[in-house]
Structure formats: structure tokens, C-alpha cells
């Protein structure tokens, strides 16, 4: 029974090796499930399981019956109207990032929101266009269009050439069809990952990586909108360093800038930025955020229409938008083939952003979130959106913040927002016809402030974790230089490389006892340390595998202060000389040491030829000699063999989670080298699976025995102290007891069973 004794930690138990512990404490027979067992569970069915699956697939069936109509409906309506207005404006603005007509941004704002209502698990995120995703789709579309055959038209891309599309230019129709295909494929990838329950892949996108990537992507968005702000004709670039080519194209024709577009964009951007800052600073006092984007859009459209900016200043405007939705199209398989890599990146970034934002709100409001179901919801939304000519989306941070801050309680707010978008598409879209594209570009840039402010993360990460800081910086550089697709792939690879680097060069340490307790810490960190004479405790804080087994060996040699293999070879060479002297009768043994009747001895050429490395690495065998050799004493003829005081080595493997074949072989070689020079090795802190794995690898033999494993460092240290006949008076003479008992150390064959006379209490 465990009972508290003040603030003291008092434990009385035997010193346990792993073998002794398993003998005294029988293990339960656990049944490890096989693949067939898991398959049976997956394929079995019951009414409860069927209900659980339906509720999981359609989360709306869980929360809609519990909807508090009187308490939540008004809040959801107010939130939905605010979110819908923002969704309309962002849809129009982010369509420019894909380089397609703005009306398709409205489609991208409508369909995903409707699908997410039924399949999503978050109650607060607003699903639709997101600037980073729009930029990635635009680059994928540019790549797909550039790979298409020169005479390829919109019809071959799946867009029928009918009267409804006659107002579109051919290149716009081609880009619309390509964007739809990219969106459908991204949705298929997300849906497949959700069905297969492998949403965990997003864990490879760390917070630092996502922050660096979105910051670099925001810079790409900024550069891509310059052509609309200056109203310049800039060709699309999809190859690496494309951002620099775009900048060159912009500044090489800067003299062609449309001043009316530039001035309008700067005014809108300035006003939007100021009001957004006011919204942020006074969010606790404002009942709802000031809808500055909507206000500026109305003003800009009215001024453009009243002053006839299109004809007077030749500004680029949104233009006529046909009311209603266009018929669905069939995705193009060839576009799938040309953009599969880009689509994978789009799918993963979309999920990572949406899931991270949804996680914040789920923790804040305490409701469950299912990552795999989120993948299904986003995937279905993108598939439907692509079929109806929209483009891939996720959740815009600002739009979700509006939905939550204006009182949104459930996805009913998302439904109201979708209805607002629907009204614009069906009835009042024509009012936006005179709106300048430069205004939409300014609105898009106004939403980048939060992402561009992430540059401040560099200093914070540098102070907290330099590896994370390096990941952020390299992700930013890769994404800027290589583009969004290749940059993301290179960033993930670099991040995984840092993980390998951390485990390949772990911070190994030498431990010692603190304050005569059972606590062992790095001996460099504390003053009151005790290290038993001739005992070294070495800790490795990472897995040991093929990449770091060599580093582990080097650090261990540094810790003990000598190479066991070098000592072994020196001793075997010395033993050959001693054995030769003894056979020739030139060596006598006295109580005071060796007496040699010759002054020197030379190896014959034949003997030197036989001194092969393999022979010198074998265990030292002195059974044929009539005397014992003390390798730390003086040897005859001044034979030089390094003297070592180490007799016991403890390896703390409590942080070693796994070994591979190469590391097992290397570890066994290291242990054999120490054992062959009479250094007892003990391994502590491992779990049962670790030892079972060593058994499967046939790790144990006549030299390396299973009895070297102990439960804790303290168990191993006490075992060594008793085994070496250490007197307790050396540690705490005032607390010694006169009574003594016979204590048997049972090492289960690893070491010879010996009987020691030790004190009743063993204290430091």
C-alpha cells in the first residue's frame, strides 16, 4: 500500500534487475491484436455502430436537433449577414489571384459553405476562398495551361463553347476550366484521405512551417496583385524564381501605370487598414466590427459608375456578370495528370489551415473536432465547387473571425452567409459591374496584414527554439525562390531533415547522483553531486538507429575517457608478449610482481604477421597462465598498457524509443568491447518491448546477457556498490547500523552468484 509520509519520498524494496523483477512479479497475458482482429472490428456491424457512423458522417444530425432556436437564431442571422458580405467581397477579390473573372469567386464562396453545413464538424469557421489557396490554384492553372497543346481550346478542357460563355475570352475560359479541374482533383485527394482515415499526414506541417509558408505566400499574393493595382499586362510565370520575373515585368513597364487605378487602390488600402486596426483595438467595445470592406466597395462602385471611370480613365472593372449559375462541367483528365503534385499541396495546405483555425475555436468553445471528417467535408465541398466552375478554398482567417466575433453559434451562420452570396449571384450582381479590379486587389492586400506580421515570429522562435526558427526561415526562402508548390515540398523535406539531424546528433550526457537520493542528473548542472568511484552513467536522449550509432559510440568514448577497443588490442598484444616470456622461462611471478630475466624482447616477423586485427579484437583469455594479470599494475619489461579505473558502465536508455538492425549490431559490438576489458555494462530504463525486440534480433549470447538490464539507474548503482563490496561508512557513517545480513545478488546467470555481507541499510 502506498501511503504519504509528510513531504518525504520513502521507498523500501529489493534491488531489481529486469529478470529478477519479472520472476517476482508475474506479467498478465496480453493479447496483441493482429491485422485480422482489426479487420473483423472494421467489418462488423451493429445498430449502435451504424448510428455512430451516420452521426459521424453527417455531424449536422448531432447538433441540429439540439439547436437553441430562441437563443442562437438571432445571433446566427446577424453573424451570417456580416460573414456573407465579407464572403462576397473576398470571393471577388481572390478570384483575381486565380486570374479568372471575379464572378467565379462567388461560386467558390457559395458551394463549399453549403456542403460544409452538412458534413463539417466546426461550428465557427467560414469555408470559402482563401488567398494562399487561390494563389496556389492560380499557379497550378498557369502550369496546366502552359503544358496544353497550342491549339487546345476551352471545349477540350471540359468547358462547352455555348452562348452563355461567348462573353468570355478564350484564355479566360481555358483558365476557368483548368481551375475547376484542379479544384476537383484537390477535393478528391482530400476525400480519399478522409475516407482512409489518414488525416494525420497534416502533422508533417508544423506550426513554424505553416507560418513561414503562409508569410511567403502572402508576399507572392502581394506581388501578383501589383498588375491590377498598376493595371499592367504581366505574363504568368510558373517556374522557380517566378516572383522575381513578375517584379521585373512590373517595374520594366512602370511608366504605363494607370494613375486612376493606382490612386484608388492606395486610398482603399489605406482606409481599410486603418479601420481594421480600429476594429482590432476596440473589438471589446464595438458590438460588431465595422464592415469597412463592404463600405469601401459600395463607395468605390458608386464613384466609378457616377464618374464613368471606365471610359474616362480606362480603368479595368469587374464588368457584366450574368445572373444565375452556369451549367456544371466535366473535369479534364489531362489536367489531372499535369497538376497532381500541385493538387496534393493544395489539398494539404487547405486542410492544415482549416483544421488549425477550427482547433482554436473547438478549444475555446469546448466541442469535439474530427480531423478526418473535416477532410471529407472540405473534399466534397471542393468537388462540388469545381464541378460548378469554382476554385479550391479553405477558411479565410478574417472571415472566420467575423463569423465568430459577431456572435455566430453554429453553421447556420454559414448558411445565412451563403444565402447572401446567392442573392448577389442571382439578383444584384450587376451593381458590382463598375467596380474597379484595383479595388478588389486592394481588398485582397488588406487581408494579408496578419500573415505579413508573422515576420515577428522569427525573433520569438529564435529565443525559444533555434531549430524551429531555422525551419521558418528556410521555408520562407524556399517558398519565395521555388514557388508555392516546390517550396512547400522542399520545406517539408527540410523539416524532416532537421528531425533526423536532432536525433543524429543527440545531446548525450554523463549523470551523477544528487544529494545522496535516487535522483540522477547531468553532472555539469549541479554542485552536490556524487559519482561512485569507477562507475560511469551515460544517458542517450534519442532513438538509436543507423544514422547515429557512430555518434553514440564517439560520445560514449568521450564520456569514459578511453576507447575500449584500443585498450583491448593493447592488452592482447601485451598478453602475447607475457605468454611468450612465460613459455621461455624468462618470467617469474613473486608476491611483489613480475620478475623478468631479460631486458628486452622483440617480436619476430612471423609473430608480427600473425598480429591480425581480428585476433586482437577477441576476448582476453588468461586461463592457460598460472598467474593473474592485473592490468592496472606494472607489467614486465615496461610493457605499456593504458590503465583504466572504470569497472562499471550504466547506460540510461529511458529515452531510447527504438533500435534498428544496424544500431543493434553496433550496440552489441560496443558492449562486447567493454565486457572484454572487464567493464561491467548495465542498461536501465527500457520497456519490455525493447527487450523483446533485442531477443528477436538474437542480441544475447555468452558475453552479452539479459541480466545486464535493470529497472532504474538507482537499482543498477546499488547493485554495483554491493557487488564491489563498498562499505556504507564511506557514504554516511553516522547512520550505519551494526546489524548485518547475508545478501545474495541473483543475476540470473549474467554474473556469477556471489554472497556479500552488507549492511541492513544501504545509504549514500
Swiss-Prot record:
InterPro entries: S04_transporter_CS, SLC26A/SulP_dom, SLC26A/SulP_fam, STAS_dom, STAS_dom_sf. The keyword Cell membrane applies. SUPFAM superfamilies: SpoIIaa-like. The keyword Membrane applies. GO terms for biological process: cellular response to cAMP; chloride transmembrane transport; intracellular pH elevation; membrane hyperpolarization; monoatomic anion transport; monoatomic ion transport; sperm capacitation; sulfate transmembrane transport. Its main location: membrane. It is found in: Apical cell membrane; Membrane; Cell membrane. Expressed in the colon. Expression is significantly decreased in adenomas (polyps) and adenocarcinomas of the colon. It is a multi-pass membrane protein. N-glycosylation is required for efficient cell surface expression, and protection from proteolytic degradation. One of its GO terms (molecular function) is chloride transmembrane transporter activity. Keywords: Antiport, Cell membrane, Chloride, Disease variant, Glycoprotein, Membrane, Transmembrane, Transmembrane helix, Transport. Residues 98-99, 146-175, 219-257, 364-374, 433-469 are extracellular. It is linked to Diarrhea 1, secretory chloride, congenital: A disease characterized by voluminous watery stools containing an excess of chloride. The children with this disease are often premature. Mediates chloride-bicarbonate exchange with a chloride bicarbonate stoichiometry of 2:1 in the intestinal epithelia. Plays a role in the chloride and bicarbonate homeostasis during sperm epididymal maturation and capacitation. Interacts with CFTR, SLC26A6 and NHERF1. Interacts with PDZK1. Interacts (via PDZ-binding motif) with NHERF4 (via the third PDZ domain); interaction leads to decreased expression of SLC26A3 on the cell membrane resulting in its reduced exchanger activity. This is Chloride anion exchanger. It comes from Homo sapiens.
Amino acid at each position: 500500500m502506498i501511503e504519504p509520509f509528510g513531504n518525504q519520498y520513502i521507498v523500501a524494496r529489493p534491488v531489481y534487475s529486469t529478470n529478477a523483477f519479472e520472476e517476482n512479479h508475474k506479467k498478465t497475458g496480453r493479447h496483441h491484436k493482429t491485422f485480422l482482429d482489426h479487420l473483423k472490428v472494421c467489418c462488423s456491424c451493429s445498430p449502435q455502430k451504424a448510428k455512430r457512423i451516420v452521426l459521424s458522417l453527417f455531424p449536422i444530425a448531432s447538433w441540429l436537433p439540439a439547436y437553441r432556436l430562441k437563443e442562437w437564431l438571432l445571433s446566427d442571422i446577424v453573424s451570417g449577414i456580416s460573414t456573407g458580405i465579407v464572403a462576397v467581397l473576398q470571393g471577388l477579390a481572390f478570384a483575381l489571384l486565380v486570374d479568372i473573372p471575379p464572378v467565379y469567386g462567388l461560386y467558390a464562396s457559395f458551394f463549399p459553405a453549403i456542403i460544409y453545413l452538412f458534413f463539417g464538424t466546426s461550428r465557427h469557421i467560414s469555408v470559402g476562398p482563401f488567398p494562399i489557396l487561390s494563389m496556389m490554384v492560380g499557379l497550378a492553372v498557369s502550369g496546366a495551361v502552359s503544358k496544353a497543346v497550342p491549339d487546345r481550346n476551352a471545349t477540350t478542357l471540359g468547358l462547352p463553347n455555348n452562348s452563355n460563355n461567348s462573353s468570355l475570352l478564350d484564355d479566360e475560359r481555358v483558365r476557368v476550366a483548368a481551375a475547376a479541374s484542379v479544384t476537383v482533383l484537390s477535393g478528391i485527394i482530400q476525400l480519399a484521405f478522409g475516407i482512409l482515415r489518414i488525416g494525420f499526414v497534416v502533422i508533417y506541417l508544423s506550426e513554424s512551417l505553416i507560418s513561414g509558408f503562409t508569410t511567403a505566400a502572402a508576399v507572392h499574393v502581394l506581388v501578383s496583385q501589383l498588375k491590377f493595382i498598376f493595371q499592367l499586362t504581366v505574363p504568368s510565370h510558373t517556374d522557380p524564381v517566378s516572383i522575381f520575373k513578375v517584379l521585373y515585368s512590373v517595374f520594366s513597364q512602370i511608366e504605363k501605370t494607370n494613375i486612376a487605378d493606382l490612386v484608388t487602390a492606395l486610398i482603399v488600402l489605406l482606409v481599410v487598414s486603418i479601420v481594421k486596426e480600429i476594429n482590432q483595438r476596440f473589438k471589446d467595445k464595438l458590438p460588431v466590427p465595422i464592415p469597412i470592406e463592404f463600405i469601401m466597395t459600395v463607395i468605390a462602385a458608386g464613384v466609378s459608375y457616377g464618374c464613368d471611370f471606365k471610359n474616362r480613365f480606362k480603368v479595368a472593372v469587374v464588368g457584366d456578370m450574368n445572373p444565375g449559375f452556369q451549367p456544371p462541367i466535366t473535369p479534364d483528365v489531362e489536367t489531372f495528370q499535369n497538376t497532381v503534385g500541385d493538387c496534393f499541396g493544395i489539398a494539404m495546405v487547405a486542410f492544415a489551415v482549416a483544421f488549425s483555425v477550427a482547433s482554436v475555436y473547438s478549444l475555446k468553445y469546448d466541442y469535439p473536432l474530427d480531423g478526418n471528417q473535416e477532410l471529407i467535408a472540405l473534399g466534397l465541398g471542393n468537388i462540388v465547387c469545381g464541378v460548378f466552375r469554382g476554385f479550391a478554398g479553405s477558411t479565410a482567417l478574417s472571415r472566420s473571425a467575423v463569423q465568430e466575433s459577431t456572435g455566430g453559434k453554429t453553421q447556420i451562420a454559414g448558411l445565412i452567409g451563403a444565402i447572401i452570396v446567392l442573392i448577389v449571384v442571382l439578383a444584384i450582381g450587376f451593381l458590382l459591374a463598375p467596380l474597379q479590379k484595383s479595388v478588389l486587389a486592394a481588398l485582397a492586400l488588406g487581408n494579408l496584414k496578419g500573415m505579413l506580421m508573422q515576420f515577428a515570429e522569427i525573433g520569438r522562435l529564435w529565443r525559444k527554439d533555434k531549430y524551429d526558427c531555422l525551419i521558418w526561415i528556410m521555408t520562407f526562402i524556399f517558398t519565395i525562390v521555388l514557388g508555392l508548390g516546390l517550396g512547400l515540398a522542399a520545406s517539408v523535406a527540410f523539416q524532416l531533415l532537421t528531425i533526423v539531424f536532432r536525433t543524429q546528433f543527440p545531446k548525450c550526457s554523463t549523470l551523477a547522483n544528487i544529494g545522496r537520493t535516487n535522483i540522477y542528473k547531468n553532472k555539469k548542472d549541479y554542485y552536490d553531486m556524487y559519482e561512485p568511484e569507477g562507475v560511469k552513467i551515460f544517458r542517450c536522449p534519442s532513438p538509436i538507429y543507423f544514422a547515429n550509432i557512430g555518434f553514440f559510440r564517439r560520445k560514449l568514448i568521450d564520456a569514459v575517457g578511453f576507447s575500449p577497443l584500443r585498450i583491448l588490442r593493447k592488452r592482447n598484444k601485451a598478453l602475447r608478449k607475457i605468454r611468450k616470456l612465460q613459455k621461455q622461462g624468462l618470467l617469474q611471478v613473486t608476491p611483489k610482481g613480475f620478475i623478468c630475466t631479460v631486458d628486452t624482447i622483440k617480436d619476430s616477423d612471423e609473430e608480427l604477421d600473425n598480429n591480425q586485427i581480428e585476433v586482437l579484437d577477441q576476448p582476453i583469455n588468461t586461463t592457460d597462465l598460472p598467474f593473474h594479470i592485473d592490468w592496472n599494475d606494472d607489467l614486465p619489461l615496461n610493457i605499456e598498457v593504458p590503465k583504466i579505473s572504470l569497472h562499471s558502465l550504466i547506460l540510461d536508455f529511458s529515452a531510447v524509443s527504438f533500435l534498428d538492425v544496424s544500431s543493434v549490431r553496433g550496440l552489441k559490438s560496443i558492449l562486447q568491447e567493454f565486457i572484454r576489458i572487464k567493464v561491467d555494462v548495465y542498461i536501465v530504463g527500457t520497456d519490455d518491448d525493447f527487450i523483446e525486440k533485442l531477443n528477436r534480433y538474437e542480441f544475447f549470447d555468452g558475453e552479452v546477457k539479459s541480466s545486464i538490464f535493470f529497472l532504474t539507474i538507482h537499482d543498477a548503482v546499488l547493485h554495483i556498490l554491493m557487488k564491489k563490496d563498498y562499505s556504507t561508512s564511506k557514504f554516511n557513517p553516522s547512520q550505519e547500523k551494526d546489524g548485518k545480513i547475508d545478501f545474495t545478488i541473483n543475476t540470473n546467470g549474467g554474473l556469477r552468484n556471489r554472497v556479500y555481507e552488507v549492511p541492513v541499510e544501504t545509504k549514500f
